[in-house]
UniProtKB/Swiss-Prot annotation:
PROSITE patterns the UniProt entry points to: CB, TYR_RECOMBINASE
CDD domains associated with the record: DNA_BRE_C
GO biological process entries: DNA integration; DNA recombination; establishment of integrated proviral latency; symbiont entry into host cell; viral genome integration into host DNA
Organism: Chlamydia psittaci
Similarity field: Belongs to the 'phage' integrase family.
Domain Core-binding (CB): 14-101
Protein name in UniProt: Virulence plasmid integrase pGP7-D
Amino acid sequence: MSGLSHHHKSRLFLTVLEAANVWLATLSPITRKNYASGIKFLVANHILDGSMKLEGLVCCDHCDILNRIKSLTFTYSGKPVSEASKQARAACYISFTKFLYRLTKGVIKHASPSKDFGNPTFYKIRDKVKTEFISKREWLLFFDALKKISFRDYLIGKLIIQGVRKLTEVISLRTEDISFAKNQVTFKVKKRQNRYQEVKVSYPNFLMQELQDYLGNREGWVFVSGEGQQVAINQVYYYFKLAEGDINSPIKVTPHVLRASALAYLKKMGFADQEIMRVSCLSSTQMLSAYDTGMTDNLTSQLPLIF
């Protein structure tokens, strides 16, 4: 460590929470919210000491910390900790240490997940996604209610479900991403290592006409607030909740639920996996199969009676 410049040494005198705040500020809104919750969890459960200087992590055994996270059964307040929660906190810690590795130019090493057979840090918890789906009838009722409340958020939801898109992709649209002549919208899909992939999605005439009516002659962000700024995620969730309440939906209707419902619907309708993967940007058939709502018959039901 003696070879470090003074600039890099000074970073080791940041506290864990100070460094975490710097890290969180570099993340996208949804990731920031999730990882802020993760850091708070790790500090509250004495996995991390928020007041400790970063120099205390130089000789830290990351494997021990990951094992402590994975060994939790209850929080300090007595709440049970699920496997999904433990894996999410472990992912948060690993990502945080990778940031510290970059921040300190390698002085603090980053944590790596264990792949030991029988005790891996990460493993598949369930075959099917936990998200509840809504039926076509339910989303038609939802959109009727949403259209009366907020035409902007109605259009956002329509682009999500018709194009199998994520909310962040839709609210990031700019007017130059839309070709009304081709009935086509170009989405920028974020991939790993801050790379972006452009995905062109064709929409039906009536939806493109509604979008054109909403835009008028405006340029810039497609979906804007009353002040003309890019619409915030929480605004969309607010109006979705109002529409959900109007139809007394037993299922919480969120942008994620709309996208998941679209994937489940396409699978149910028998569209080819490769086609669904191409438009949704899912990277494997295994990921797509998690949205398959079809019941698989037990093999024995297809055999002749033995007795």
